[in-house]
C-alpha cells in the first residue's frame, strides 16, 4: 500500500470548471501525422502527453488538458493526439447493455483501440515535440483505455518521468511489476477491486491509488456530467491530485 499523501497542496488558483459549453483554450497542430490538441505556455519546459479515452475529443477531456496546462504554478505544455484519427467510439455505446453495443465496443477494442496500434507512436510523438517545442521532461496521463496505454508506456526505457491513470480500463496485475516511474491511479467505483489490488500488490515504484467509489468510469473525461456538483467536485479533486503528484516527482528538486 502506498503511504504517500494524496491531499492537494497546490492548485489554489484552480480556474472555475465550466459545466456546459466549455471553450477550449488551445489549438490543433499535427504531430507524427496526427491531429493533436495543444495547450499551455509555449515556453514551458515540461510536457504532459494526454491519452484520451475511446470517445476521443470531448469538452470535458479538453478542459482537463487546459487545467493541467494552466492550473499549477508549474506550467506545462500539454498535448492530446487524436490516436483514432477522427473515428473514435460512439459514446452511445455506453453502457454496453445490449448485445449490439457490446459487439461494437468489443470490435473497437480489437481494432482501433488495440494497444499495439498506439504504443509505437508514443515515443515518436515525444521525440518530435521535444525537438520542436524544447520540452525537457515529460509526464503522461491517460483515461479509461488511455490508462492501459499509460501503464504499457511506463516500463523500462520510457521517455516519461511520472504517470497517471484515471478510471483505467483493462487493469492487470501482470502489468505492474514492469513500471519504472512514479505512478498515480484514480479508480472509479466501476473498476474491479480485485484487479486493482493485484496491480497495486505488484508495483515496485512510488505510487498512489486513490479510489473515487461514488464516481462512474469516465468521470474525469468524456462521460463526466459536470452539471452534477458531486461529479464536478470529484473532477476538480482528481486533476488537483494528478498535478500535485506530477509536481512532486517531476518538478525542480524531484528525486527520481
Where are each of the predicted segments found?
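N-terminal cap/leader regions of alpha/beta-hydrolase-fold enzymes
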Residues: 1-256
Amino acid at each position: 500500500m502506498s503511504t504517500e499523501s494524496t491531499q492537494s497542496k497546490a492548485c489554489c488558483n484552480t480556474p472555475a470548471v465550466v459545466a456546459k459549453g466549455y471553450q477550449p483554450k488551445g489549438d490543433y497542430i499535427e504531430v507524427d501525422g496526427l491531429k493533436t490538441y495543444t495547450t499551455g505556455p509555449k515556453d514551458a519546459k515540461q510536457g504532459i502527453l494526454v491519452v484520451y479515452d475511446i470517445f476521443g475529443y470531448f469538452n470535458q477531456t479538453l478542459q482537463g488538458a487546459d487545467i493541467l496546462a494552466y492550473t499549477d504554478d508549474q506550467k506545462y505544455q500539454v498535448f492530446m493526439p487524436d490516436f483514432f484519427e477522427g473515428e473514435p467510439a460512439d459514446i452511445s455505446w455506453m453502457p454496453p447493455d445490449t448485445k449490439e453495443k457490446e459487439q461494437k465496443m468489443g470490435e473497437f477494442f480489437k481494432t482501433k483501440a488495440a494497444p499495439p496500434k498506439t504504443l509505437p507512436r508514443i515515443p515518436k510523438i515525444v521525440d518530435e515535440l521535444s525537438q520542436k517545442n524544447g520540452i525537457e521532461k515529460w509526464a503522461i496521463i491517460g483515461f479509461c483505455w488511455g490508462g492501459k496505454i499509460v501503464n504499457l508506456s511506463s516500463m523500462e526505457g520510457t521517455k516519461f518521468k511520472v504517470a497517471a491513470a484515471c478510471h483505467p480500463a483493462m487493469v492487470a496485475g501482470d502489468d505492474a511489476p514492469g513500471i519504472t516511474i512514479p505512478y498515480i491511479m484514480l479508480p472509479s467505483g466501476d473498476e474491479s477491486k480485485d484487479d486493482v489490488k493485484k496491480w497495486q500488490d505488484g508495483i515496485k515504484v512510488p505510487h498512489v491509488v486513490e479510489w473515487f467509489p461514488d464516481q462512474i468510469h469516465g468521470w474525469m473525461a468524456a462521460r463526466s456530467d459536470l452539471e452534477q456538483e458531486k461529479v464536478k467536485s470529484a473532477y476538480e479533486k482528481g486533476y488537483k491530485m494528478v498535478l500535485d503528484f506530477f509536481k512532486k516527482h517531476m518538478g525542480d528538486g524531484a528525486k527520481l
